[in-house]
């Protein structure tokens, strides 16, 4: 979409208007009434001047009625145009915003790895609002003032076509100015939108990590980062303001020069003889009335280009390919047998392999613990099962069926994930436990909480299960948040459970509660546990030791200690640290 033309962007935006064509047509009719009634002001001046020279009783009666009718029609047209165009615009923006958000939910994990959340949020909020400006204010002005200009030009041609063509001689010059400023507005608008993403990103990081900022005394550093991002946005906005401030007076000057030449020519004896005083005044009035709509049409150009630039970014996002979901297999039930066959994986073609020929067979109901240094590929390995990523080579099988053959949603519904970075939503505890099931039975929610050893602390909260936990569970302790995450996994009742460093950042008491909860939730389920504390996985059926993307050791806790290899060294190191 980077090289998309203005017309192609307009055409795509208009496709969102199609479902609301009736309201759009009503708005066009309203603005046509407005333009016709406003143009009638020139005709009123003609009748007034000519009527003064030849007054009669009918003229005295008809002219006031003409004035009343003209302004009444103008009011009706303004109402119809403004209301129905706002209705169309807000519906278009709503549809576009929802489409962008819904598409984001379907994008693959690699996309989110390559884009900051601040820039993505900016597209849903700031970019869409720029389209709103183009879809409401800009289109309103284009239709209303554009039809007004068409009406005035038509009236001028009807009154004196020769003078009108002379008056229109400056149109090519105005077109050159508009063309230059349009390109500049689009370029600057793209920079402003990117800088707004930077502003959102810096603010989001600093505010969500305010504890780290304060404990490290980094307030001054974050202030400087934010000021730099905001100042760049200000600089680009001022360039837009400068372009707008120069272009509008230039266009007005061109119109004024044309109008001055028109008056000079119109006052020549030859033309004065061919026109009545009323026609002369009406012609000059119509030409003068054109200054305001032309000015508004040139000023709205910056808003249009901002909207086009924003829509270009949004359409580019919508063209990102969604997560691949070519599978169609939907099993009635899953036992939980997992097999990795020659699995290799790299995050990018120019990056080193993270997994190197993984072969692993896990029977139903077995608990597999995975240990190793940071960066050894543990989390990447378990991320392949819910298809957050696809293997570069090899395949992963669930119940002897390649997971690529499964329909994506049913596959993920049968996998429960609990990680160190718990995600809680700013809603009630009950809604967090039953996430994705708004009509869940309260007894089932409480049963899951009891199994996760969370019921006791929940009951002590002021509103119990109806307590709102705050942004990402800020009102709860780390252990409480972790127990809610486990309760969510228990409520899901999936046959396959993945625990990614679920207890690594907890105190001893919280870890004891969570260990008891995990022992309960793991029963009868195939479980993958990534652990930093080896004491938490001693009861695992099998322990895998990973190093640089390979499984270098496999066995029970006792077997691996007896081998006196990498696992024994890790165990000895942690034992010494504990002492």
From Swiss-Prot:
Keywords assigned by UniProt, alphabetized:
ATP-binding, Cell inner membrane, Cell membrane, Lipid transport, Membrane, Nucleotide-binding, Translocase, Transmembrane, Transmembrane helix, Transport
Q: Which residues cross the membrane?
A: 24-44, 61-81, 147-167, 253-273
Q: PROSITE patterns, alphabetically?
A: ABC_TM1F, ABC_TRANSPORTER_1, ABC_TRANSPORTER_2, MSBA
Q: Name one cellular component (GO) term.
A: plasma membrane
The ABC transmembrane type-1 domain, residue ranges: 25-306
Database matches in InterPro entries:
AAA+_ATPase (IPR003593), ABC1_TM_dom (IPR011527), ABC1_TM_sf (IPR036640), ABC_transporter-like_ATP-bd (IPR003439), ABC_transporter-like_CS (IPR017871), ABC_transpr_lipidA (IPR011917), P-loop_NTPase (IPR027417), Type_1_exporter (IPR039421)
Pfam family membership, one:
ABC_tran
> Record keywords: Transmembrane helix included?
yes
What reaction does this catalyse? ATP + H2O + lipid A-core oligosaccharideSide 1 = ADP + phosphate + lipid A-core oligosaccharideSide 2
According to its UniProt record, the EC number is 7.5.2.6
In the bilayer, the protein is annotated as: Multi-pass membrane protein
Does the keyword section mention Nucleotide-binding? yes
Q: Which SUPFAM superfamilies match?
A: ABC transporter transmembrane region (SSF90123), P-loop containing nucleoside triphosphate hydrolases (SSF52540)
The record describes the protein's role as: Involved in lipopolysaccharide (LPS) biosynthesis. Translocates lipid A-core from the inner to the outer leaflet of the inner membrane. Transmembrane domains (TMD) form a pore in the inner membrane and the ATP-binding domain (NBD) is responsible for energy generation.
Tell me its family.
Belongs to the ABC transporter superfamily. Lipid exporter (TC 3.A.1.106) family.
Subunit info here reads: Homodimer.
Q: What protein name does the entry list?
A: ATP-dependent lipid A-core flippase
Q: Which organism is it from?
A: Chromohalobacter salexigens (strain ATCC BAA-138 / DSM 3043 / CIP 106854 / NCIMB 13768 / 1H11)
